[in-house]
Amino acid sequence: CDHFGSLGHNINGGFAEYVLVDKEKVFAIPDSMSFNEAAIIESVSCCIHAVDMIHPACGENILILGTGSNGIILAQLLKASGALSVTAMGSKDAKLKLLNEYGIDTIKMDRNDYSVHEAEIKKRFPHGLDAIVDTTASPELVSKCFKLLKKGGRMVHIPSAPVFHPVLSQASLFLLLQISEFLS
């Protein structure tokens, strides 16, 4: 999103009984759709956009950072895309169990020691990952995951709130800008 704004994140009103919203931002729920279905439309659309950006190919290995609602939706979409393996990494046992029931591999994340799951990822994917999708908005976690990608690997971020901490070093950012300029 170019101008991220969300009630309860960076706009007050998430717990208000009533809230005033611009009419352009309000949509009627069709009679054929339940409230529960309508409630996840925004999350599902962001996840579909992320899958489009990743452009998963048959036989690829993809890692999802985070097992919140977006991570769980993404895992299912990517599993259906034909990727060789989809692995979700999170810290909540109940969510990891749910993903396992959907046929998705999982890695238990240790928020106090990222090297634990980093070693597990390297063991499972010794040649690196084709793509990583970040749903955590954790600069520390994301910065450690770049080295887990294969050459030409892709990383997509769909954080639930803006990240204000730079993840890339100035040198890495300069190199990315040079590569982008060369390719365009």
Which residues does each PLM region occupy?
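Mid-domain Rossmann-like dinucleotide-binding core that forms the NAD(H)/NADP(H) cofactor-binding site
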Residues: 33-111
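Glycine-rich phosphate/adenylate-binding loop and adjacent beta-alpha elements
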Residues: 1-26
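Glycine-rich phosphate-binding loop and adjacent beta-alpha segment
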Residues: 83, 101, 139-184
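Helix N-cap at the beta1-alpha1 junction of Rossmann-like dinucleotide-binding domains, i.e.
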Residues: 92-94, 111-113, 139, 162-163
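N-terminal Rossmann-like NAD(P) cofactor-binding module of classical short-chain dehydrogenase/reductase
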Residues: 130-133, 156
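Glycine-rich helix-loop-beta junction characteristic of Rossmann-like nucleotide cofactor-binding loops
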Residues: 52-57, 125-126, 147
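Short, glycine/polar-rich helix-capping loops at beta-to-alpha or helix-loop-helix junctions
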Residues: 14-15, 90-98, 163-170
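Short amphipathic alpha-helix with an adjacent loop that forms part of the alpha/beta core around
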Residues: 113-127
